[in-house]
């Protein structure tokens, strides 16, 4: 198909009209609750160290060369929004374009829309309740179920993810056609079993919030003070889709630096380029970010459920194949 006859939008106009109404409703939800809508940069001097995120970059060509540098397209507005929290913004939300240099398919587009919000002085379960409120309002769905990662893993895999031997995880992964090596990384095994065995079984009739992921998968979340084996992190699933990922946010700059350094060590082991650590973000944590919980929710996947669409292309104006 040539560019000349491939000009039509990916989604029907009727779906785009419904999408606009839903986004307006989301904005109203947050403004009525006293959150400030913010805008942060799409381009940044720093990428992300996360091993599992592939980023887009571009070159800033300043007129005289001194300011020329590589800039990274945002995979999430998280670091900038936390800098705003540290500056005293109070509770904030943002609906923004984000970019991940990964697959394009029924559930993925390299450019997509993210809803992200942060609540100072909210604990993890209070934010889970607010995500649930939003989903009920937008999707007219039943209240969410809330279960621990340990519980759902044991329920569907038959192993305790926090205490199982690595050999047991390898055996379970091989039963599900994952060609696990004898020295396979424990987190790789857990992530495979969760995504391939657990996720297809949960959130079918109503949303489910899975909380207390293993502390080795904490990312930017705090480790639970009650159980050091788990992180204060949660994810929402509904109708076969991962919708949201939230944290009781880590505010310790030293610990966050340590995690970034571990990310880069893992990148080296996997023969991936290391990423420069975002010193501005760490400086904001050092200055004092308030205790807060935050969550990122995929708007396009939310639209897929709201509009009863099986493909992400049906809810965005122009997918990557005809952008």
Curated annotation (Swiss-Prot):
Record InterPro entries: Aa-tRNA-synt_II, aa-tRNA-synth_II, aa-tRNA-synth_II/BPL/LPL, EpmA, Lys-tRNA-synth_II_C
EC number assigned by the record: 6.3.2.-
GO BP annotation list: lysyl-tRNA aminoacylation
PROSITE patterns: AA_TRNA_LIGASE_II (PS50862)
Alphabetized UniProt keyword annotations: ATP-binding, Ligase, Nucleotide-binding
Binding residue positions for substrate: 76-78, 118, 249
Binding sites annotated in the UniProt record for ATP: 100-102, 109, 242-243, 298
Nucleotide-binding in keyword set: yes
Catalytic reaction annotation: D-beta-lysine + L-lysyl-[protein] + ATP = N(6)-((3R)-3,6-diaminohexanoyl)-L-lysyl-[protein] + AMP + diphosphate + H(+)
Top-level taxonomic group: Bacteria
Keyword ATP-binding among UniProt keywords: yes
Record's GO cellular component terms: cytosol
Coiled-coil intervals: none
GO molecular function: acid-ammonia (or amide) ligase activity; ATP binding; lysine-tRNA ligase activity; tRNA binding
Pfam families in alphabetical order: tRNA-synt_2
Similarity comment: family membership: Belongs to the class-II aminoacyl-tRNA synthetase family. EpmA subfamily.
Function: With EpmB is involved in the beta-lysylation step of the post-translational modification of translation elongation factor P (EF-P). Catalyzes the ATP-dependent activation of (R)-beta-lysine produced by EpmB, forming a lysyl-adenylate, from which the beta-lysyl moiety is then transferred to the epsilon-amino group of a conserved specific lysine residue in EF-P.
Complex formation: Homodimer.
The name this protein goes by in its record: Elongation factor P--(R)-beta-lysine ligase
Gene: epmA
